């Protein structure tokens, strides 16, 4: 019996102001857990898979039911402990402590290999939590849209005089994260050709408005890119195919995209990447019966994929790894120069991290989109001079379809996050919003992750692999009063390659919530400034000084 499969269930988060838990502080994680498994949100909800290969919300359906039951009975001074998607304990703590503590996929470093994880996973002892899947704060593809948009805009600024009109981006992968790419590209003014091997993913992105259209062939897709470039219009096109075949074919034809990247689930060579020449049915069958053969075939295919990206890079085309660890997989298979093109964080995003700026997000527990529109207006009111952010919010309202509970992603940093959180809390208190707001972020943030092939690649002081920082981030968020805190391993780039922490906090309109919000939403981004200042980045040191951070090691 497969305890992870239930084709009969359809999970959706409750809407409205009536709650089934004892307070909003426990109703919030309950709704966000359920929201992660909404069919409009999750990639494979019947298997508890939210996104990112096999990133799950709960270990199995029995664990899901027990988590739900535990949250519904949890008292205001109790904390639920969740070990890799299974509820293992309820303890007496205090009202300002987190209501839920989550640890996912963590393995002692010597044993932190994909093989060992897969063995534990098969035994039912662990699950893969990705980043926001197992920490219950995934909001659909919107969760990464702005970060991807900001990256594309920065590429345009650096390489194309700030104008991406008439340019097109080649990429692959339209899953939960990669599915944000087409919309981010067109928002930035560029066209996109996105290769995807699974028809259901193309269909979902078309249905949710993240993708404009599908091409029937590579020739048609290229014709659409040429037409868009000629007319300087922005269009996103999905192409059913395998990137390991399409990318090299484009090199062979001499096709020159303007930007090249990739968001296939290469971090998981068994469950996330279709080997070259294989059918989906063959892949599905052999993942269970011959996982090592699948892994070998997938990683061999990645070599050709990455070599094509290297070829584009050699042509002078801006080419970037978007954090799926595909370069490492290719290098493991003997492609020595796989890292010759950069990752997106050191190339384009790190200056934001130095100022504690990252993917701040919130969701309306009421389920009413008007609550999000009202908070959008509040953000504009509080940050009147940030025209770039205003433009983003306007585009987001116009072009992003909500998946599950209405939510918003908005990159802001130290000094602004706590102000927004307090303002949202006041709106709840005054009855301007129909229910409380949950505020969280991706684990991809300035101070919450150690990932040498992504967020902490090429750190100035060589501290790429130091993972004390996400541990300290999680501990500080617990001490500060976050509503739930998570500590994960392997998100984004796969098992063995990252450690990262998440936090979520509820704005329920109370004075107690205001005190917690002020602490958490200051301290959380401040750890990012601290981490980058400690590594010697002048922007971070300046930000720390400007905000009065007390960093003893940098005292002059």
Curated annotation (Swiss-Prot):
Q: Which GO terms describe its cellular component?
A: cytoplasm
> What reaction gets catalysed by this protein?
4-imidazolone-5-propanoate = trans-urocanate + H2O
**Cofactor: how bound:** Binds 1 NAD(+) per subunit.
The protein's Enzyme Commission number: 4.2.1.49
Active-site residues are 410
- Copy the pathway line from the protein's UniProt record: Amino-acid degradation; L-histidine degradation into L-glutamate; N-formimidoyl-L-glutamate from L-histidine: step 2/3
Where does it live in the cell?
A: Cytoplasm
Main localization, broad class: cytoplasm
Return the InterPro entries for the record.
Urocanase, Urocanase-like, Urocanase_C, Urocanase_central_sf, Urocanase_CS, Urocanase_N, Urocanase_Rossmann-like, Urocanase_sf
The text of the family note is: Belongs to the urocanase family.
Q: What is this protein called?
A: Urocanate hydratase
Q: Which organism encodes this protein?
A: Bradyrhizobium sp. (strain ORS 278)
What is the name of the gene encoding this protein? hutU
